[in-house]
Curated annotation (Swiss-Prot):
GO terms for molecular function: DNA-binding transcription factor activity; transcription cis-regulatory region binding. This is Transcriptional regulator MraZ. It is found in: Cytoplasm, Nucleoid. GO terms for biological process: negative regulation of DNA-templated transcription initiation. Its main location: cytoplasm. PANTHER family: TRANSCRIPTIONAL REGULATOR MRAZ. The keyword Protein biosynthesis does not apply. Belongs to the MraZ family. Keywords: Cytoplasm, DNA-binding, Repeat, Transcription, Transcription regulation. CDD domains: MraZ_C (cd16321), MraZ_N (cd16320). GO terms for cellular component: cytoplasm; nucleoid. It comes from Desulfotalea psychrophila (strain LSv54 / DSM 12343). Residues 9-54, 82-125 form the SpoVT-AbrB domain.
């Protein structure tokens, strides 16, 4: 069976309680997992949403290698900041205020599928990130060649 992935991006508005309407195409992917539980993790400039199974794989990697290469501070930041979550009956996801503040999320956000997880960016930060990627696109050439894409 082919693994289903999170793809594409959508723009959303957080309501006054910090909830966002979770895109149907992302919830369809989530349904392919045994558990519908989600993990929301801080990631410096944005948040990441992981299906529980994907997060548990990442936790195993952190457990096995987190003490290497002086990563304990990063593990502390990410693991200490995670929140377990689930979609409500209306298909909304509550982003806790602590995580919204940590990632600088205002009212307008962008959800971006990253195959195994979803990113949540403040819309202004997303625009800056995208411009930086466009400006440095040639920097990806070697890696893309190594993967056989170029």
């Amino acid at each position: 069976m082919r693994k289903v992935r999170f793809r594409s991006r959508t723009e959303h508005t957080l309501d006054t309680k910090g909830r966002l309407n979770f895109p149907r195409r992302f919830s369809d992917v989530l349904e392919s997992f045994e558990s519908q539980d989600l993990i929301i993790a801080p990631f410096k400039t944005h948040l990441r949403i992981y299906p529980l199974a994907e997060w548990e794989e990442l936790e195993t990697k952190m457990h096995n290698h987190g003490g290497e290469q002086n990563l304990s501070g990063w593990v502390r930041y990410v693991v200490g900041g995670v929140v377990e979550a689930a979609l409500d009956k209306q298909g909304r996801l509550l982003i806790p205020q602590t995580l919204r503040l940590d990632a600088g999320l205002e009212k307008n956000v962008v959800l971006n599928g990253m195959l195994s997880w979803i990113e949540i960016w403040d819309a202004t930060a997303w625009a800056s990130e995208q411009q930086a990627v466009r400006d440095g696109f040639e920097d990806f050439s070697e890696g893309l060649r190594n993967m056989g894409i170029l």
